[in-house]
Amino acid sequence: MREILHVQGGQCGNQIGSKFWEVVCDEHGIDPTGRYIGSSDLQLERVNVYYNEASCGRFVPRAVLMDLEPGTMDSVRTGPYGQIFRPDNFVFGQSGAGNNWAKGHYTEGAELIDAVLDVVRKEAENCDCLQGFQVCHSLGGGTGSGMGTLLISKIREEYPDRMMLTFSVFPSPKVSDTVVEPYNATLSVHQLVENADECMVLDNEALYDICFRTLKLTTPSFGDLNHLISATMSGVTCCLRFPGQLNSDLRKLAVNLIPFPRLHFFMVGFAPLTSRGSQQYRALTVPELTQQMWDAKNMMCAADPRHGRYLTASAMFRGKMSTKEADEQMINVQNKNSSYFVEWIPNNVKSSVCDIPPRGLSMASTFVGNSTSIQEMFRRVSEQFTAMFRRKAFLHWYTGEGMDEMEFTEAESNMNDLVSGYQQIPGRYR
């Protein structure tokens, strides 16, 4: 079957990843020890997309966990589903990357990378027909960004024809964890443009806003944010794991969403998002899902789709519904908001329908869009990068690890090329 190999790196990646496995285990009826306790054959039919069946009948995630310090790994291991992972698949160093991209990419990370690649190879050999890799990481720190992109480029060398999907958490506009985020993010984007096939762009601030405004949580925790991300991650691959009327997979998604190879950074959203108190007062209908799914407030990254235009988009519906209704709603959206879609790609919204809804919902939908407005985010990071780089602030941390200023200049111009790539997209006869 079409297996997906999951890799999580750094603190952020491991926290998102462990939440994701909680969601997927729940959907497939697998308990924290790896035993199947579900009630429907559909849960087992394609369970091997994400799981390996061990000899004793236990299901083991096809997951590789890496970090440059043991802390987060220990908390994953002691967490609710910590015992389900294969112990050999935890690969960690002791030193940490200290939020330094160069440490993750060139020094500390480079020492650990072969151990990670061995585990990846072992997992890939266990697959019948590996479809691709999904990587969870953040771009603001050191390990997820530096070592994450190093791993992506190594996997790209070894498996050039497999899909590479990333869930990348970008630095937020107002909330900054570390002062060198713009450096780390720019150096990472430089790599992702070249080596990844599809990047789902996430950002903590947008996720905070969704939790605060829509879900009415007064003090959202990272756990709440990661829950949103994992719902989306599960939605992107649900068609591979459950039978559906209209299937999509990672490659179909890429073919339908990427008109130009470099422009593969997508905005994602999920519906229905309702606060816990108001759930019972809302009917779940396809029009309602569609409306929320296309709502700008629902996007999980800090860019406003109303400031740009959609090149392409994909809507993945889950639950019992008529495909005709789903298609009609999509056509409806395009007709009503035609100025927000480029007119030189006709029918640029792809929809797919999977019969099994997420736990506790009768229907749901996941949105993935390729919008030119995502340049706002790259522009913002780029401006912060330039402000510091002009003064050569904090550079010694990177050059001390053997990096060259030239590399910063290259990354900066690659980011600017990406932004102008989005800006040059012709609008409506202007």
Swiss-Prot record:
Gene3D superfamilies listed in its UniProt record: Helix hairpin bin, Tubulin/FtsZ, C-terminal domain, Tubulin/FtsZ, GTPase domain
UniProt KW keywords: Cytoplasm, Cytoskeleton, GTP-binding, Magnesium, Metal-binding, Microtubule, Nucleotide-binding
Localization (cell): Cytoplasm, Cytoskeleton
Needed co-factor(s): Mg(2+)
Binding site for GTP: Q11, E69, S138, G142, T143, G144, N204, N226
Coarse class of the protein's main subcellular location: cytoplasm
Residues given in the record as Mg(2+) binding sites: E69
MF GO annotations: GTP binding; GTPase activity; metal ion binding; structural constituent of cytoskeleton
Protein name: Tubulin beta-3 chain
Species per Swiss-Prot/TrEMBL record: Gossypium hirsutum (Upland cotton)
